[in-house]
Amino acid sequence: RDLRMSRGLGDVYKRQQEHNARRGEFKTVHGTVQTPAFQNVATAGAIKGGLSAHDLKDIGAQVMLCNTYHLHLRPGDKLVADMGGLHKFTRWNGPILTDSGGFQVFSLAKLRKITEEGVTFASHLDGHRIFMGPEESMQIQANLGSTIAMAFDECVENPAQHDYSKDSCERTTRWLKRCKAEMARLKHEGISVNPDQLLFGINQGCTYADLRVEHMKQIAELELDGYAIGGLAVGEPTEVMYEMISQVEPYMPKDKIRYLMGVGTPGNIIEAVARGVDLFDCVMPSRNARHGHLNTWGGIINIKNAKYERDERPIDPACG
């Protein structure tokens, strides 16, 4: 059956529901996203390997994902703002989602120090000290002018102790409230490049179902534009990831888009869609393609192998 639910820009979500899989439309100021959808990762504003914004349109891409941390370091978010925001900077006119930078701070950066205010860390480029907290992340994303801004969160290492994961979830909730308040301030003062920028919150809790569920209940009350599941696909068994999604899904708002961060293998996407997820991203497709690894219905092939040099057959017989 079709259900239409409207709470304003970005929240119009038409869906057809069969079991937990959903078919929907997510409307934004930069266009409507047909879901389920995969976001192509353009970390610093371009897909590695030489793909242009025109190429993305040609292959039917709907959303481009750029990274707050990397763009802040180089070329600098203020420069991007001076050039009119990411859409003018990249010449991509569709929806753009910017990651908050939290994952990179906790995975790439060295010598980090976490406090209630935020995180102090050393740049992976030259080692200089940087501070980033909820307000700073929102300010950078306001300069970038993305369609969707992700809230600043703590992505704990896996495995992590239950007590630390619980404290981290509570801190991430407090940071989310600060993100929401800062975005409202930036819009009110006319500072944001995109006054219609949307905010997604991120569910954390490592691989502890009780923490995942409780955290989702907390952030679902904040009336955000969308909700993401973060901190998965970081080394835990695949079945554990699926179980965490299944545990959290009943507590995710039905009328809001759902995003599983960092997941992008065909099998993972199908399994997650069946569990009620709408949106995905991963560097794997473009990274694999650059190295000649191609997905087919029969599995992955390495097109650089000598046996394919004079092979005239279609790469995938099902697509021939």
Task: List the predicted regions and their residue ranges.
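Single conserved hydrophobic/aromatic residue that forms the stacking wall/gate
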Residues: R1-Y13
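Non-catalytic, usually N-terminal nucleic-acid engagement modules in DNA/RNA processing proteins
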Residues: D11-V193, N305-D311
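Glycine-rich phosphate/ribose-binding loops and adjacent secondary-structure elements
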Residues: E170-T173, E182, L186-H188, N194-I315
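Cys/His-rich short segments
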Residues: D316-G320
